[in-house]
């Protein structure tokens, strides 16, 4: 039996690669407009980082991580998300000593052993932004403006909903958790086994449960917005004011808690037809939690597979780049040498050029050139070499002509 790709993974084939390049280039460009620079972190980290950073009661840590022991006896985990590794890098490399805020973006593969769903595999890819060093609501609004601009203006996606909430600070949450536990007590026996554990350790996680019975129970649960303190309420009001002044529409959804324990104050999700396209929020205590200095922070993750799926479903075309500008057909060994030389010089001039490497007939070479979408086809044989000329056909209109084998003249025609 042939070895196949593992369940939940997918090959990115050459015919699809340009789509990934397109969205990555768009996201790199808008990141630069906001003064955000790239970071790259390792594929795997110490398991302890995610236990402490993401939260031991989360589904990610309890059920979904790919964890193994390496040959040195260390517990290692393939990263299930990008924020905790970015925080670790921020601390380990003393980036907190630089001028703040520190703004970074990344493209990274992530790994979660979870039930596969539309636009989400077990190995998936994220574009993420993390901003360290500012506790102002203005940075939250700035990042949300980037997200909505990218999705609506750069990619042209319609029908998106930006939903926001505030999870307050630890003091707010302590009061809310007590109220939530009081509400949940009468339905405790109907909770799933995981949520029964959460009831004592972290009742807010129950709001994020995907089990149908638990989702029904929390529908009428208390709203955390009724329990946030004056400072957190002021922060949320400022966020809304900043979004209003930029003309960014939003909905307030008190049931957004996100699936990771590190969030505080602002949390958000961008929804399209019931699917979360993008989500994130503020995590003012995470840097301290993993032994760094007290540092407020804000970030989000955007699933690239899901983004590509939406673009496809919306009929938004991604322009396919020209694969081959010039195909040089040759007849005989002498002509093959000239074709090799010409292709080399064309490529040096920035022109995409190909030649035959299979010993095909000229007819078969021209058929291949047409198949790969060559803009021009050249033909070289012994007579062309003797006359120092080359036959050129412009594929768009079929016009044929001859020019000298002078590289500068050929480049001017093609460009």
UniProtKB/Swiss-Prot annotation:
Keyword Methyltransferase belongs to the record: no
The reaction(s) this protein catalyses: tRNA(His) + L-histidine + ATP = L-histidyl-tRNA(His) + AMP + diphosphate + H(+)
Domain of life assignment: Bacteria
GO cellular component terms, semicolon-separated: cytoplasm
GO biological process: histidyl-tRNA aminoacylation
InterPro entries named in the record: aa-tRNA-synth_II, aa-tRNA-synth_II/BPL/LPL, Anticodon-bd, Anticodon-bd_dom_sf, His-tRNA-ligase, HisRS-like_core, HisRS/HisZ, HisRS_anticodon
Record-level Gene Ontology MF annotations: ATP binding; catalytic activity, acting on a protein; histidine-tRNA ligase activity; transferase activity
Residues in coiled coil: none
Keyword terms of this UniProt record: Aminoacyl-tRNA synthetase, ATP-binding, Cytoplasm, Ligase, Nucleotide-binding, Protein biosynthesis
Subcellular compartments: Cytoplasm
Subunit: Homodimer.
Family annotation (NCBIfam families): hisS
Family, per entry: Belongs to the class-II aminoacyl-tRNA synthetase family.
Protein name, per record: Histidine--tRNA ligase
Species this protein is from: Clostridium perfringens (strain SM101 / Type A)
């Amino acid at each position: 039996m042939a070895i196949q790709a593992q369940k939940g993974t997918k090959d990115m084939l050459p015919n699809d690669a340009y789509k990934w390049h397109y969205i990555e280039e768009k996201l790199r460009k808008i990141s630069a407009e906001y003064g955000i620079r790239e970071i790259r972190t390792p594929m795997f980290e110490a398991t302890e980082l995610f236990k402490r950073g993401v939260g031991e009661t989360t589904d990610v840590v309890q059920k979904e991580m790919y964890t193994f022991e390496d040959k040195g006896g260390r517990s290692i985990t393939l990263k299930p998300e990008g924020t905790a590794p970015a925080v670790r890098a921020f601390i380990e490399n003393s980036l907190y000593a630089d001028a703040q805020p520190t703004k970074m973006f990344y493209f990274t593969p992530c790994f979660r052993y979870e039930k596969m769903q539309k636009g989400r595999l077990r190995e998936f890819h994220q574009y993420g932004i993390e901003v360290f060093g500012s506790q102002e609501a203005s940075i939250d609004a700035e990042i949300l403006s980037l997200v909505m601009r990218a999705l609506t203006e750069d990619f042209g996606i319609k029908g998106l909903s930006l939903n926001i909430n505030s999870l307050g600070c630890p003091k707010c949450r302590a009061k809310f958790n007590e109220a939530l536990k009081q509400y949940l007590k009468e339905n405790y026996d109907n909770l799933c086994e995981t949520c029964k554990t959460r009831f004592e350790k972290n009742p807010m996680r129950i709001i994020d449960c995907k089990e149908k019975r638990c989702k029904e129970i929390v529908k009428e649960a208390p709203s955390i917005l009724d329990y946030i303190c004056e400072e957190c309420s002021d922060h949320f009001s400022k966020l809304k004011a900043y979004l209003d002044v930029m003309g960014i529409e939003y909905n307030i959804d008190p049931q957004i808690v996100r699936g990771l324990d590190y969030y505080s104050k602002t949390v958000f999700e961008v929804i399209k037809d019931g699917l979360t396209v993008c989500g994130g929020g503020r995590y003012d205590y995470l840097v301290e939690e993993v032994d760094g200095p007290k540092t407020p922070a804000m970030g989000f993750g955007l699933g690239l597979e899901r983004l590509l799926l939406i673009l496809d479903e919306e009929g938004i075309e991604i322009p396919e780049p020209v694969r081959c500008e010039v195909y040089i057909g040759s007849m005989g060994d002498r002509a093959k040498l000239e074709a090799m030389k010409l292709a080399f010089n064309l490529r040096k001039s920035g022109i995409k050029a190909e030649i035959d490497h299979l010993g095909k007939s000229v007819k078969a070479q021209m058929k291949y050139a047409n198949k790969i979408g060559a803009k021009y086809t050249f033909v070289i044989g012994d007579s062309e070499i003797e006359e120092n000329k080359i036959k050129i056909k412009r594929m768009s209109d079929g016009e044929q002509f001859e020019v000298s084998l002078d590289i500068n003249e050929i480049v001017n025609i093609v460009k």
